[in-house]
A protein has these predicted regions:
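Long, positively charged amphipathic alpha-helical accessory segments at protein N-termini or as interdomain linkers
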Residues: 1-31, 40, 44, 158-165, ...
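N-terminal lobe of the biotin/lipoate ligase/transferase fold
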Residues: 2-181, 201-203, 255, 329, ...
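Solvent-exposed beta-strand sheet faces enriched in polar/charged residues
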Residues: 50-52, 190, 208
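Short loop/edge segments at beta-strand edges and connector loops
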Residues: 91, 189-191
Length: 353
């Protein structure tokens, strides 16, 4: 842990209570000069740290800074039963999913944390921003700094993954739960991986699996989650303004990205230990597609394959059940659907991390 992280942790544990420079130097085992440099660096990052007359430092409010220490501290408070989860945070990265895939390929599952009372091992990769955020079907996920949350949860379940589709479905429900807890806002789901608030997309999920070539089973998965938190209209291109939104639409909400990262991660771990039927039931209750007329895109990029249908249901395997205009009922496990009035197939901000 860096000196800056140690100082931030110490001040965060004493919100609105001054901590002397000497006390910080002793607890961090560094010089007063190193403390002064760390304080200045934190101020440059936006932390409201005041100097007091007796030479102490006062943190006025919890800063919206994402790092390994702030996440570990928050996660330990929110989910003490999952404490010790392996986490890595980056200021910027090409893609959290790409990085997670790289370390999973190089190191295997040895670095994952075996979570007590769960059915597998986990780790989480978090970034302040992404330069090459990825979505489904090779699309881009726009990931600007300090306005969103971009994370990838690595999951290696006992016995492998029998139904990969349920991972995306479960994660979508988990994100909705986290947003409700932190912001008290109800969100809805567009099959299969998009979260909507006020008719605008605020989150996408990209799930990727690792197959054991000897057994043919999927041993591990990476669940990439990208959430727009406090963007305003100036943060979106004219194209994205038609489809993309954010949770807060400004930067004044007191909730921090660390709090959301903690809740999303914990809710995902929790829900992956639930029965599949209960997950599907909640997923269906949050879907806004059932009963709607849609266009089905079974092969992305091939407009000749598009057909119109009515959404009837979401079945127990997380497939979208539709009825085409000729009366045929189909269970969709891949592809995309769009409402006639929407622009949900925009090439950007489409999903994932």
């Amino acid at each position: 842990m860096t000196t800056k992280e140690l100082v931030l942790n110490a001040l965060s544990n004493s919100i609105n209570t001054p901590v002397s420079g000497q006390a910080l130097a002793v607890s961090c085992k560094v010089s007063r000069t190193a403390i002064w440099k760390a304080i200045n660096s934190l101020r440059e990052e936006g932390c409201q740290i005041e100097g007091t007359t007796n030479g102490g430092y006062l943190l006025k409010e919890t800063p919206d800074i994402l790092n390994t220490q702030t996440f570990a501290s928050q996660f330990g408070k929110d989910f003490p039963e999952f404490s010790g989860l392996h986490c890595q945070c980056f200021k910027t990265i090409d893609s959290t999913n790409t990085y997670a895939k790289k370390i999973l390929t190089q190191d295997g599952t040895g670095f994952l944390t075996r979570i007590e009372k769960s059915k597998g091992a986990f780790a989480v990769i978090i970034a302040e921003s992404q330069t090459a955020g990825r979505g489904r079907l090779g699309r881009t996920f726009v990931s600007p700094q300090k306005t969103g949350l971009y994370l990838s949860i690595i999951y290696s379940p006992d016995g492998g993954i029998s139904n990969p589709a349920i991972l995306t479905t479960a994660s979508a429900v988990a994100v909705c739960r986290a947003i409700k807890k932190l912001y008290n806002k109800e969100t809805s789901i567009k099959w299969i991986n998009d979260i909507f608030l006020n008719n605008k997309k605020i989150c996408g999920i990209l799930t990727e699996g690792f197959t054991n070539f000897e057994t043919g089973a999927i041993d591990s998965a990476i669940i990439g989650i990208g959430i727009n938190i406090n963007q305003n209209t100036k943060d979106f291109s004219e194209e994205l303004l038609k489809t993309a939104g954010s949770i807060c639409n400004d930067k004044t909400d007191s909730a921090t990205r660390t709090q959301l990262a903690s809740l999303v991660t914990g809710e995902v771990i929790n829900i992956l230990n639930q029965e599949q039927d209960s997950i599907i039931s909640e997923y269906k209750s949050r879907s806004f597609l059932i009963g709607k007329e849609v266009e089905v895109h079974p092969v992305i990029g091939d407009t000749s394959k598009i057909y119109k249908a009515k959404v009837l249901d979401i079945n127990s395997e997380a497939n979208l059940v539709v009825q085409s205009q000729d009366g045929e009922i189909k269970n969709l496990s891949s592809g995309e659907v769009s409402l006639k009035s929407d622009l949900f197939t925009s090439d950007k901000n489409s999903s994932g991390s």
